[in-house]
């Protein structure tokens, strides 16, 4: 029998069966009218629950049979830093590719951007499944959460340029918060965001440290500006291609 990190987890199955997400899912799915424009959208709450179960089971099978067997090698090889660039271990990249091919990288994103339009509870279950297989890969997979922040607060140009690529899994993200003298106390952040009127550009000055997946393509950087603390979106050269 094929191993599955969802179906063999009684705790996750119990919560999926008993969580009452009907109100939240009804709002997410626009009263279950989204299917008229997006064929993959559920037509009812029962349909949504069936879809969630299938997604979790698919991920559970990938995690157990394709990701977990390579986790030890991922730890042993680790990330590589050469010529100023950080790269994941080859087996970590293989794990990400499996998740991309299964179309599991846009969990929280709306249908219009190619996402799965899942409630946050479902993503947390997905993160638990990946964590069981490979905690390092879980950090990369879980940080797709920042795409939901962009979907909620970004402008339209930003959304159209970035979110479909998150859903495709071709870019990754990170939250850039911690500094040498500001960890859990984010009010102590000293990095500054300075606006350059001549070039119409925001420039960041400061030091960040201990950033999970800090080599990501899309970074949300917490910095001080004249209006207080704000998150600025930084894109790598790869993300701008």
Where are these regions (language model features)?
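Short coil/turn segments at secondary-structure boundaries
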Residues: 27-32, 70-80, 109-111, 139-143, ...
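Glycine-rich phosphate-binding loops of NTPases
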Residues: 231
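Long, contiguous hydrophobic alpha-helical segments, chiefly transmembrane helices and signal peptides
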Residues: 12, 16, 55-63, 67, ...
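Extended, charge-enriched "interface" segments that sit outside catalytic cores
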Residues: 1-82, 86
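Internal helix-loop-helix
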Residues: 60-61, 90-160, 164, 168-169, ...
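Glycine-rich, Trp-frequent "lid" loop and neighboring beta-strands that shape
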Residues: 116, 157-226
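Conserved small/polar residues in nucleotide/adenosyl-binding loops
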Residues: 234-239
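Hydrophobic alpha-helical scaffolding
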Residues: 2-5, 45, 49-53, 81-86, ...
């Amino acid at each position: 029998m094929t191993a599955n990190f969802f179906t063999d987890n009684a705790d996750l199955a119990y919560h999926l069966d008993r969580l009452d997400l009907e109100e939240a899912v009804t709002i997410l799915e626009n009263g279950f009218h989204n299917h008229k424009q997006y064929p993959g959208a559920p037509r009812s709450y029962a349909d949504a629950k069936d879809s969630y179960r299938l997604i979790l089971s698919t991920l559970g099978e990938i995690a157990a049979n394709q990701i977990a067997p390579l986790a030890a090698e991922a730890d042993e090889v680790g990330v590589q830093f050469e010529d100023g660039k950080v790269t994941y271990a080859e087996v970590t990249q293989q794990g990400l590719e499996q998740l991309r091919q299964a179309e599991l990288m846009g969990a929280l994103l709306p249908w219009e951007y190619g996402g799965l339009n899942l409630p946050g509870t479902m993503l947390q279950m997905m993160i638990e499944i990946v964590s069981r297989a490979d905690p390092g890969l879980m950090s990369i997979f879980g940080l797709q959460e920042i795409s939901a922040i962009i979907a909620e607060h970004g402008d339209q140009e930003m959304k159209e340029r970035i979110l479909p690529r998150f859903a495709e899994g071709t870019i990754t993200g990170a939250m850039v918060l911690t500094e040498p003298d500001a960890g859990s106390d984010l009010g102590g952040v000293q990095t500054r965001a300075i606006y350059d009127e001549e070039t119409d550009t925001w420039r960041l000055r400061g030091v960040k440290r201990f950033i999970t997946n800090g080599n990501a393509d899309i970074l949300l950087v917490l910095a001080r500006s004249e209006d207080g603390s704000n998150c600025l979106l930084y894109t790598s050269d790869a993300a701008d291609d």
